[in-house]
Every structure is written in structure tokens, then in C-alpha cells.
Amino acid sequence: MRVLIKNGTVVNADGQAKQDLLIESAIVRQLGNNISPQLPYEEIDATGCYVFPGGVDVHTHFNIDVGIARSCDDFFTGTRAAACGGTTTIIDHMGFGPNGCRLRHQLEVYRGYAAHKAVIDYSFHGVIQHINHAILDEIPMMVEEGLSSFKLYLTYQYKLNDDEVLQALRRLHESGALTTVHPENDAAIASKRAEFIAAGLTAPRYHALSRPLECEAEAIARMINLAQIAGNAPLYIVHLSNGLGLDYLRLARANHQPVWVETCPQYLLLDERSYDTEDGMKFILSPPLRNVREQDKLWCGISDGAIDVVATDHCTFSMAQRLQISKGDFSRCPNGLPGVENRMQLLFSSGVMTGRITPERFVELTSAMPARLFGLWPQKGLLAPGSDGDVVIIDPRQSQQIQHRHLHDNADYSPWEGFTCQGAIVRTLSRGETIFCDGTFTGKAGRGRFLRRKPFVPPVL
């Protein structure tokens, strides 16, 4: 199969040019002007549009069981939504397994979840929910099998203590893996939450008040120091929501420490006032939404390069699930927001079209740096000969209002309802195959491939 994309502006992280792009047998074969491929081929006219590498979302939670509920997006509906939003690769954070299980247990479970459902290419982050000799011995074998990143939690049921974190950091570093972490101070959160519950303060706004930004920032600072103690182990902070944590990361970078950080559209564009609305329960996520001042600090990090990745933390529970389980109590509500379909459009509209970032920086945040950090470069995150033919075409002339009824996930609401975006996803290609075109999903379940990722190699800081 040959596909020729003509008349568009092809953008990579290191530059852009108005040129044609030829994909053949799922791979980018040529970029240039006046390409004349051998017949037969499909021609796509991208006049007036940007031609970007397909998005790489390195933080999703599909089909996750959080104990009180299972998320309503599986690997079909979740990756379908991703495809319709211009994302062609996801790396899913696997949920916790049974108490005491091996690392491999969850990999086998999740490969079963995705095998016949994923629309786009996918991989997984390992999850370390306890530490013992068997777990530490298993890590190098998992890296050899293509899982080169693992997640630790400093909160929730399977949080690790500092000694366990140090052991994990050392072994992951030795094994060629990147440590990712959910950083919140569990003890401080538990104390604040107990105070509010005892006082009968259980409305959604108290979710945010029970998890102040200092809980997140303290845990970030602690992880930075533990990573240094563990031999300058590489560290990746997920879903940053505040400026103080970003300050700590800037300081670590200034000291040449290998640390990277992601944020998410919700922390850039939504704020804590959402909790005081009639449907405030639908904005329960952790870390919580912050105030506009923290948003501005994150946008500074987006603009000046301090933030490396924009992912989604897509973790969808329906409003019916939320209301039935929580009964109005924030502490009982399952956490998470949908967003995998909206990431690329929201960042393009609020970043590129407002002049906050360049199209090249957009590529760096949404595909190139995620691919480099997580062992997929240059197969993903790049439009160059030899790379996969993963493409998203965005028309900056079109304006769209986000409406849940037009989205493709399995949620029954969107936190972005009514947002107007300048720029529309008009086509998504995965390995040269059109899987979304002009509002219509054209992919199929099971066409996505499991990606064996390369061991971690740090990008130049």
C-alpha cells in the first residue's frame, strides 16, 4: 500500500517544510517535492494543513480495576478515541494485580486485554506494587522483553516506602529502565482527608483541599533526592499539577540530574472552580485541579522547555459510576478523567494557535520526546525515511466545539464539553492506514501491535 500526502507542511521537532510525504508498506519512504510514486497509490491533499507525527500518549489507564470500579474504556474504545484524536501510539499504565503477584502477571493480563481490541500500536509500563528479591530479579528480564519503564506509587494501597523506592530505583537504573512515579505524600493526604470527613465536609471541593499542592511537591522533591542517592537514577514525574513541584524539577535539572516531567491538558486548562459546579464530582482526579496561578506556571514550563511531555492520564469512570459509588462523598469517588481524544487538539489550539508554542514544540511535547524517553524513537515520534507511517493531519483553519456526543470513548460525559478549539484533526494514519477521516472512525479492533521498547537511553538534557 502506498500513500502520498501532498501540499502539506510537514513538521518534526527540529523543523518544518512544505513538502510531500510518501508512505509505502507502512513505513515513511520519502519526503520532498514533486514525488511521483509507482502506481497504484492513494493521494491525500493536505493543502493548508500541518502534517505531524502521530501522537504518542504515554499515560493511559484502559480497562483498569481500581477495586471499587472498573474503568469504562477498554482497549478498543480507548484506542478508538485516541485514534480519532490523532494519537497513534499509547503506553498504558497497568493497574495493580493480586497481592504478592509477580511483575509478569500483570503483563500477561494486560496483553490479553489489548491483543484483539487495540486499534493503534501499544505498550505498557510495568507496575511495582511491592519489593522483594523475586521482584528485583524479574526486572532485567522484563526489560529484555521490551518493558523499559516501571511505575512506583507514593500513595494508594500499594505505596512504597523510602527504602523500597531506593531498591527499585537502583535495580531499574542497573537494568536499563526508567522509573516513573506518582508523587503525593500519602500520610499528609490521609490526615487532611480524615479531618474533612470527621467534620462532614465531603463535597467535591474538599477533594482538592485534602490534596494540597504541597503534598505533591514534597513527594517530587523526595523522589529527586532518592534518585540522586540511588546513583543518579533517571526519573520521570507523571501528571504534574503545580509550580512548586516544577521549581524543584528545574533545580534538579540545573544540577544536571536526569529527571523529566509530564503534565496533562486538565492541569493546563481546567481549574479548581470546577469542583463548585453542580456536577463537580466528575472532576475528581488525583492530583486534583489547581488554581489559575498554578496553570500559568505550568504554561511557562510548556513554553520554556521545563516540561517535557503532555500526556492525558486518561482514566474514565461514568457519571453513573461516580454518583452511585460516591453517594456525594469525594473520598469514595473513583478518580480519573477522559481525555485521550482531546489531547492533541486542545494543545494545538491553546498552545500553537495562541502563540505559546511553535508547531515544532508541539511535536516535541506530544510525540517526539515521549518516543525518545520510552524507547520508541525513531520508529515513532518522527516523520523521516524508515519511521512508521504514523501521521496526524491538522487543519488550523477549522474551528470546532467539543461535544461529548461526537467523541468516541465510552464515557457518558466530557470534562471539555463546550470548549471551542481552533484547529481540527482531519485525518489519522497508523502505519499508512487511514483510521480516522473527517469525523469518521475507519480503523478496526485488533490491528494495533504490541511494541517491544528499547532500554532507556537518556535524551540530552
Curated annotation (Swiss-Prot):
It holds the Pfam family Amidohydro_1. GO terms for cellular component: cytosol. Substrate binds at Y156, S286, N335. Keywords: Hydrolase, Metal-binding. A divalent metal cation 1 binds at H59, H61, K151, D313. The modification N6-carboxylysine is found at K151. GO terms for molecular function: hydrolase activity, acting on carbon-nitrogen (but not peptide) bonds, in cyclic amides; metal ion binding. A divalent metal cation 2 binds at K151, H182, H239. Its cofactor is a divalent metal cation. It catalyses: D-5-phenylhydantoin + H2O = N-carbamoyl-D-phenylglycine + H(+). It is an enzyme of class 3 (hydrolase). GO terms for biological process: pyrimidine nucleobase catabolic process. Binds 2 divalent metal cations per subunit. InterPro entries: Amidohydro-rel, D_phenylhydantoinase, Hydantoinase/dihydroPyrase, Metal-dep_hydrolase_composite, Metal_Hydrolase, Metallo-dep_Hydrolases_sf. It comes from the Bacteria. Its EC number is 3.5.2.-. Carboxylation allows a single lysine to coordinate two divalent metal cations. Catalyzes the stereospecific hydrolysis of the cyclic amide bond of D-hydantoin derivatives with an aromatic side chains at the 5'-position. Has no activity on dihydropyrimidines. The physiological function is unknown. NCBIfam families: D-hydantoinase (TIGR02033). Belongs to the metallo-dependent hydrolases superfamily. Hydantoinase/dihydropyrimidinase family. Homotetramer. This is D-phenylhydantoinase. It comes from Escherichia coli O17:K52:H18 (strain UMN026 / ExPEC).
